[in-house]
């Protein structure tokens, strides 16, 4: 078995398992978004926490920040190719939650 330092599951979990991180990825999977839009969709997240999560995801190359030369300045966040590769994980979690964690019947999606 691989050590935690070389285990790909452990390394991925270190990146995406922080509180709010997968929800930021989930929302950005729908398309680029401004900070205030993310803050509204992630009910309960503080601006500081959102800023920290976005910065950490940027440092990992999962999210990119686009600044537009406008007045007032406009900034949008989007998933990179590396971030898009995490979308199937989010979708799998959605299916799992629908099947095992809710009272509603799960939608059967062929693998």
Task: Give the predicted meaning of each segment.
Residues 2-52, 69-70, 76, 107:
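N-terminal helix-turn-helix DNA-binding core of bacterial DNA-binding proteins
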Residues 17, 69-93:
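Basic, amphipathic "hinge/linker" alpha-helix immediately C-terminal to the N-terminal HTH DNA-binding motif
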Residues 85-111:
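Amphipathic alpha-helical dimerization/coiled-coil segments
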Residues 65:
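Short beta-strand "wing" residues that participate in macromolecule-binding interfaces
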Residues 11-12, 82, 96:
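Residues within well-formed alpha-helices
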Residues 61:
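Glycine-centered, phosphate/nucleic-acid-interacting loop/turn motifs that mediate DNA/RNA or nucleotide
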